[in-house]
């Protein structure tokens, strides 16, 4: 729900550049078609939106992580907020690094003037893994019972399985190009996927 409300179809962009999905050449999806052909123009609104929408998620996540302790509430609620924020920050960076390569990596909102130098792909992936393997993300439940985490029979908040599935995707990406970490990371991906399958 957070993903769709904040990024709409933007997370599909890395898939359009691969073999998972393609666009209909007869459709009016020019924005997607340019990305599908690896030929987006400078004015491509989808690319601009993808960048700004995902950095908006990162900025919100950083704000929560930095300021949750100042909120007058119980420890369980604070930890839950940080859990969710770390996952969404990792998820946003994972989408961005696959699309753009080297990107600015910010873990605070102190430098908001857009002058940060890009971090390397490897540095970005290291932070993604750090967030997804943090104590907070490791402690997420398999399901929720009460609103707002659980609405209309659906887990709305991030679950343990969502983290494991995302880690599997991250390790798969790290195993191949451009990092080329190889067999060990394919095994990590398989191990995480097995956790999801086995519940």
Model-derived segments and their meaning:
Residues 1:
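Mature N-terminal segment immediately following signal peptide/propeptide cleavage
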Residues 4-37, 65, 98-104, 125-149, ...:
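Aromatic-residue-lined binding/catalytic grooves and analogous aromatic/hydrophobic interfacial grooves
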Residues 25-100, 114-126, 132-150:
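Conserved, well-structured interaction surfaces
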Residues 107-111:
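Outer-membrane beta-barrel translocator domains and adjoining extracellular loop/strand segments
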Residues 70-76, 105-106, 180-183:
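Short coil/turn and helix-start
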């Amino acid at each position: 729900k957070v993903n769709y409300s904040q990024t709409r179809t933007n997370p599909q962009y890395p898939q359009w550049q691969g073999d998972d999905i393609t666009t209909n050449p007869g459709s009016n999806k020019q924005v997607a078609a340019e990305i599908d052909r690896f030929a987006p123009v400078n004015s491509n609104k989808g690319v601009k939106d993808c960048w700004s929408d995902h950095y908006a998620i990162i900025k919100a996540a950083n704000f929560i992580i930095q300021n949750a302790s100042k909120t007058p509430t119980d420890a369980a609620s604070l930890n839950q907020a940080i859990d969710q924020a770390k996952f969404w920050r990792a998820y946003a960076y994972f989408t961005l690094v696959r699309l753009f390569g080297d990107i600015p990596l910010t873990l605070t909102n102190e430098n908001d003037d857009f002058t940060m130098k890009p971090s390397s792909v490897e540095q970005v992936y290291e932070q993604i893994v750090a967030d997804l393997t943090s104590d907070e993300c490791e402690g997420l439940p398999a399901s929720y019972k009460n609103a707002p985490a659980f609405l209309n029979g659906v887990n709305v908040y991030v679950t343990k399985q969502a983290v494991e599935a995302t880690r599997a995707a991250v390790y798969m990406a790290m195993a191949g190009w451009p990092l080329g970490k190889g067999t060990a990371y394919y095994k990590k991906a398989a191990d995480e996927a097995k956790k999801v399958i086995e519940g």
